[in-house]
């Protein structure tokens, strides 16, 4: 089946958001709401806070092409957030992050949706070293994980669906998007909820963007890791700064006296996901041996990794909502 995407008309009245029950989807919903706009929220998981005014809920998996295509009918844009948001098995990454993303793009094409905004990640280029900061928007892929590989593949799909089928496709390489920065590294990489809303709104409304790759980060005092040139070209102007959280975060950091240039999570864009012992650490964390790992370790980076895993377990993994 072949459908030709319609051109940009300046109005974004119906937006499909996949993975809408997840962390970023939950933060975006109130920030993208408009009186003349419908948010069509698609997720395999229920919405914990219910369906609000101007919202529709579609319970479906992003791996179900028929359901996805039906959900995309009549929409002006798709925001594709669904997928596993961290490092798991290759099989899960392949099914949910790669096949699920293909399904989202193909469903948009079949339904005639003119624009797809994809939530990519800094982990697509995680092994980009500090010496290259600020990282240009179109930096060559250097994934740090299977998860990062899935984002590289998805960015390739975005390029294909623009060049072959004419869709406007924008990939946002999100760095650290939580309600508050969770750790010292995030003082440099945080994308605030309000700035996330501003960035996605700019991507929704910019006329004829074509295929773009942009970074998602706030105006952090300790930033400068990545370029915001392409994001600003779309109309994004960040307003928030993680520095307001710096005092409390650094007070709790046992390595606060280590300068940034020597602090291992700041040596590569992928942070801790570039550490050589990542596989072993993830295995320990997922196997219920975190306490043993913590007690047996005196190194700062293992403690930091434990904190990161706690954060993901508590608030990040629930957005892995495209499991069929």
Per-region residue spans from a language model:
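NAD(P)H-binding glycine-rich loop region in Rossmannoid oxidoreductase-like domains
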Residues: 55, 60-96
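Glycine-rich NAD(P)-binding loop of the Rossmann-fold in SDR/ketoreductase-type enzymes
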Residues: 63, 92-103, 111, 141, ...
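Catalytic helix-loop patch of NAD(P)-dependent Rossmann-fold dehydrogenases
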Residues: 95, 132-169
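Conserved Rossmann-fold NAD(P)-dependent oxidoreductase catalytic core, especially the SDR/UDP-sugar
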Residues: 103-142
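Alpha-helical substrate-binding/gating segment
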Residues: 174-180, 190-211, 219
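Conserved C-terminal active-site "lid" loop/helix of NAD(P)H-dependent oxidoreductases
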Residues: 213, 221-237, 251-279
């Amino acid at each position: 089946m072949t459908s030709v995407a319609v051109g940009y008309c300046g109005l974004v009245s119906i937006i499909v958001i996949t993975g809408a029950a997840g962390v970023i989807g939950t933060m975006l919903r109130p920030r993208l709401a408009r009186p003349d706009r419908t948010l069509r929220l698609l997720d395999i998981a229920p919405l914990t806070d219910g369906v609000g005014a101007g919202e529709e809920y579609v319970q479906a998996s992003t791996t179900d092409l028929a359901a996805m295509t039906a959900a995309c009918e009549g929409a002006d844009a798709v925001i594709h957030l669904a997928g596993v948001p961290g490092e798991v098995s290759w099989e899960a990454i392949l099914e949910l992050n790669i096949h699920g993303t293909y399904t989202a793009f193909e469903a948009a094409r079949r339904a005639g949706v003119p624009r797809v905004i994809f939530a990519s990640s800094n982990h697509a280029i995680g092994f980009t070293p500090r010496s290259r900061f600020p990282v240009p928007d179109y930096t060559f892929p250097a994934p740090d994980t299977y998860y990062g590989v899935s984002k590289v593949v998805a960015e390739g799909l975005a390029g294909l669906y623009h060049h072959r089928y004419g869709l406007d496709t924008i990939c946002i390489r999100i760095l650290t998007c939580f309600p508050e920065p969770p750790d010292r590294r995030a003082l440099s990489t945080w994308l605030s909820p309000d700035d996330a809303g501003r960035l996605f709104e700019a991507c929704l409304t910019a006329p004829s963007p074509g295929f773009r790759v942009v970074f998602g980060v706030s105006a952090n005092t300790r930033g400068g890791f990545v370029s915001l040139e392409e994001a600003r070209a779309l109309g994004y102007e960040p307003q928030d700064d993680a520095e307001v959280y710096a005092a409390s975060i650094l007070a709790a950091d046992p390595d606060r006296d280590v300068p940034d240039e020597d602090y291992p999570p700041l040596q590569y864009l992928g942070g801790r996901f570039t550490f050589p012992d990542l596989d072993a650490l993830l295995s320990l964390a997922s196997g219920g041996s975190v306490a043993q790992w913590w007690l047996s370790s005196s190194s700062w980076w293992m403690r930091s990794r434990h904190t990161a895993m706690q954060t993901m377990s508590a608030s990040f993994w629930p957005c892995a909502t495209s499991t069929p």
